[in-house]
Curated annotation (Swiss-Prot):
This is (R)-phenyllactate dehydratase activator. Pathway: Amino-acid degradation; L-phenylalanine degradation. Its cofactor is [4Fe-4S] cluster. The gene is fldI. Homodimer. Involved in the fermentation of L-phenylalanine via a Stickland reaction. Required for the activation of the (R)-phenyllactate dehydratase complex FldABC. Only in the oxidized state, FldI exhibits significant ATPase activity, which appears to be essential for unidirectional electron transfer. This protein is extremely sensitive towards oxygen. Its EC number is 3.6.1.-. Transmembrane segments: none annotated. Keywords: Hydrolase, Iron, Iron-sulfur, Metal-binding. It comes from the Bacteria. [4Fe-4S] cluster binds at C128, C167. Binds 1 [4Fe-4S] cluster per dimer.
């Protein structure tokens, strides 16, 4: 019997992610490109996974797109919401997951999962950039520390400062003022991470926390935010190895299920 190859394409606001699965369970290739919808990112991510998997797009049996820019991808057989795809991808990685906190480039989502992995309900904030990946990108530029180094730097802090502004624009001004006063960079970064964690934890508490708590999305790679989140919630947080790829993984899993249904 021939192998079945499916691809999930997660086109976010700030990054493009792809996962190719073989027979609905084996990850053959994956890619993350740090530009999202409306850019060359999706095409580059797709080209990358196909090259790694030694496949052409014609070799794929089914493709599902998800994310902010899911409707912009013409080759998809189906589009599925990122909420469902994140839930599916996280549960595939760890079937003990019951609460999923996903911090994206422009929004924050908290998902509640059933024991079966089905998405029960969700709460999200997409009205303000504060607490999102975009917020961290802005702060990274202001303090001149690469965004992927923020987490490690935050752990060096002995005296985290307080960022009181909840608006990105005002928080940026506040950080600039604190820099001018000579506040240590690591203390500022720790304060920034704590500010993100506080905002996200507030949303998560409104949803209700049930263990296991899993953090998904690119911000999950920021150890400073993760540690601050654990302190805010008073419990450990599980981070999957490929946290930024959970949406694309879920989309590829849905692609496999859809192909099987349509074939039967």
């Amino acid at each position: 019997m021939a192998d079945i190859y499916t691809m999930g394409v997660d086109i976010g606001s700030t990054a493009s992610k792809t996962v190719v699965l073989k027979n609905g369970k084996e990850i053959v290739s994956q890619a993350v490109i740090s530009v999202g919808a409306g850019t060359s990112g999706p095409k580059r991510a797709i080209d990358s996974v196909l090259k790694d998997a030694k496949l052409s797009i014609e070799d794929l049996d089914y493709i599902v797109s998800t994310g902010y820019g899911r409707n912009s991808f013409d080759f998809a057989n189906k589009q599925i919401s990122e909420l469902s795809c994140h839930a599916k991808g996280v549960y595939f990685d760890n079937n003990k997951a019951r609460t999923v906190i996903d911090i994206g480039g422009q929004d924050i989502k908290v998902l509640k999962l059933a024991d079966s992995g089905r998405l029960l309900n969700f709460i999200m904030n997409d009205k303000c950039a504060a607490g999102t990946g975009r917020f961290l990108d802005v702060m990274s530029r202001v303090i001149e520390v690469p965004v992927d180094e923020l987490g490690k730097k935050a752990l060096e802090s002995k005296n985290p400062c307080t960022i009181s502004s909840t608006c990105t624009v005002f928080a940026e001004s506040e950080v600039i003022s604190q820099l001018a006063r000579g506040v240590k960079t690591e203390d500022l970064i720790a304060g920034i991470c704590k500010s993100v964690a506080s905002r996200v934890a507030s949303l998560a508490k409104r949803s209700g926390i049930e263990e296991l708590v899993v953090m998904s999305g690119g911000v999950a790679k920021n150890i400073g935010v993760v540690k601050a989140m654990e302190a805010e919630l008073g419990r450990d947080i599980y981070i999957s190895k490929n946290s930024q790829l959970n949406g694309a993984l879920g989309a590829s899993l849905y692609a496999y299920e859809s192909f099987q249904k349509e074939r039967s």
